[in-house]
């Protein structure tokens, strides 16, 4: 059977659009905090990825605007992000969208501007079970967690990021049809108590931290061994308390 190039392009667009993802909300110590979209999540108008590394959308996605609420936590709590596609019970993201996951923190007063983003968590390719972070996110029903660090009490932005590499064989700046896809979501979080707090160090800017020459931005997952992949810097902060990709709760049981 023969297919026209136009038809294949259309099919590719439809498949791509059906694969996009956003953060629905968060859980704290296994307790669902409810639908956070435009409430405590700075939600973009749709689930399209960001691809332009120089765009201000690299900060907290499109329309980085303050939303009315913030989720209260304490240092040492487990904060879990829950991603979704269109509805909470559908596929999280296409299985073809292999890539890493990271979580950053910044003071909310900065609105994410400047050298303020500090990496708390990173997971890319697991050589033990030969899976990408996104593969395990799908298995975990869209949930991954980070432990709230011991920083000064106050308001913060937690920036969850997925980098989908299925079209990262080319750079967006050279071929806008392709390029790595960034799924970004910022949650407004208030840390109420923290013993022995450690000041956040200087961080990196978004946009600015990633460039065309940054490791992990251009990578051909089809021809290059996944074991050679290096996630984009910066490295995880020494004061970070870790995280994981695992399901902590089942929304269908609520």
From Swiss-Prot:
One GO BP annotation of this record: cellulose catabolic process
Cofactor: Cu(2+)
Example GO molecular function: metal ion binding
EC class (word): oxidoreductase
Cellular location(s): Secreted
Residues at which O2 binds: 166, 181
Disulfide bonds: 60-186
Residue positions the entry lists as glycosylated: 52, 129
InterPro entries: AA9, AA9_LPMO
Keyword Iron-sulfur: no
Keyword annotations from UniProtKB, A to Z: Carbohydrate metabolism, Cellulose degradation, Copper, Disulfide bond, Glycoprotein, Metal-binding, Methylation, Monooxygenase, Oxidoreductase, Polysaccharide degradation, Secreted, Signal
Main location: secreted
Methylhistidine: modified positions: 20
Cofactor: binding comment: Binds 1 copper ion per subunit.
Protein residues bound to Cu(2+): 20, 97, 183
Pfam families linked to this entry: AA9 (PF03443)
Family to which the UniProt record says this protein belongs: Belongs to the polysaccharide monooxygenase AA9 family.
Function: Lytic polysaccharide monooxygenase (LPMO) that depolymerizes crystalline and amorphous polysaccharides via the oxidation of scissile alpha- or beta-(1-4)-glycosidic bonds, yielding C1 or C4 oxidation product. Catalysis by LPMOs requires the reduction of the active-site copper from Cu(II) to Cu(I) by a reducing agent and H(2)O(2) or O(2) as a cosubstrate. Is able to cleave phosphoric acid swollen cellulose (PASC) in the presence of a reducing agent, yielding a range of cellooligosaccharides dominated by cellobiose and cellotriose.
Protein name stated in the entry: AA9 family lytic polysaccharide monooxygenase A
């Amino acid at each position: 059977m023969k297919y026209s190039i136009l038809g294949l392009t259309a099919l590719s667009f439809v498949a791509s659009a059906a694969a996009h993802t956003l953060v629905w909300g968060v859980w704290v110590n296994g307790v669902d905090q409810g639908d956070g979209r435009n409430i405590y999540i700075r939600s973009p108008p749709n689930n399209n990825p960001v691809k332009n590394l120089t765009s201000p959308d690299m900060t907290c996605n499109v329309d980085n605007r303050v939303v009315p609420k913030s989720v209260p936590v304490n240092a040492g709590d487990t904060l879990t992000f829950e991603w979704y596609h269109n509805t909470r019970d559908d596929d999280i993201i296409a299985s073809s969208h292999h890539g890493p996951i990271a979580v950053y923190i910044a003071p909310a007063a900065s609105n994410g501007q400047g050298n303020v983003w500090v990496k708390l968590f990173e997971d890319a390719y697991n050589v033990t079970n030969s899976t990408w972070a996104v593969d395990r996110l799908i298995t975990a029903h869209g949930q991954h967690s980070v432990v709230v660090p011991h920083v000064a009490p106050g308001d913060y932005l937690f920036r969850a990021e997925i980098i989908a590499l299925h079209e990262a064989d080319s750079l967006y700046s050279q071929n806008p049809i392709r390029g790595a896809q960034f799924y970004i979501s910022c949650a407004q979080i208030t840390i109420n108590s923290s013993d022995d707090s450690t000041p956040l160090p200087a961080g990196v800017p978004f946009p600015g931290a990633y460039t065309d020459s940054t490791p992990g931005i251009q990578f051909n997952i089809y021809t290059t061994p996944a074991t050679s992949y290096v996630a984009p810097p910066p490295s995880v902060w020494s004061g970070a308390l870790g995280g994981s990709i695992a399901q902590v709760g089942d929304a269908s049981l609520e």
